[in-house]
């Protein structure tokens, strides 16, 4: 690895990148300073088994690099780049994720429902201690949002599959085309396994607009079943990372894309990196705008202003009277949030937002069943999903050892 990159890190005593910036609490200063390549990989995988992925797609400016002490006097340390380089090098040189077998866990069986980032992390950390782990995945391949959400131009599938194979090499069994609420019964699994971790995400479309040629961004990105967007005018409604991914994907398919967002750019939940990359792709932005109706290619809009409301953490968009205007669109793609699959979680106690309710140990209302990631309403980034998987694996381990 480039020595200059290593030396740029100040090796701060307080480790803000690790303790304040990283949701997973990766041992960032340690893996940066470690000159032994295999030991550096060991440090990375002591907290995250998806370093090659997170090192490429994390919103660094909002997390580790955003609080980097170096960033106060210049550019922050390239933490993501270093992490990805360590993991890429490990795969090239055949380094494996280490095991730490606990004899008391070798007779235990755990089912992981959902093979996305959270499920993979939990599965890997249990398997490396000797637990017999089976992943149940609804698609014909693992990855979740990594393979059915994030576009190829942001994350190469080859990288994702190499990372997944490293985890599966720990001895994990996978059963594909298995979906809870369809051909997978939670009660039957409770009888077969000592514990279950539910990490199925929350990808059901939140369709808030009526009309033809309206699509869910989540569904388009998940199934890759795109209409012919070439030379068509497309509006993407939303301001998060999914909106940016959808807009850039449609732009790459030849569409004329405009993002419509009801707040200002500074209020966008998307990462700074994603917003800048979307602009670089020549996607147009229409801020402080609400879509009211869509009919026969006419999008009726109204301008908004942001107002402060008591008990609200964010300013709230308010329609401005007499500010209506129209846009033209052949298609509208909605990226205004997603919802849990109601059928899949019908037997669980829910929180006030409709997600599965868990306690501080990630336990649900069902016996032996834990849950994490988007399905419990966790912040929708890969790093937070991985963090849930790591924490849940520790809680499941303690549960199994009782």
Predicted regions and their residues:
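FAD-site-proximal beta/loop scaffold in flavoenzymes
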Residues: 212-232, 312-379
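Residue-level detector of alpha-helix initiation sites
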Residues: 49, 116-117, 141, 240-242, ...
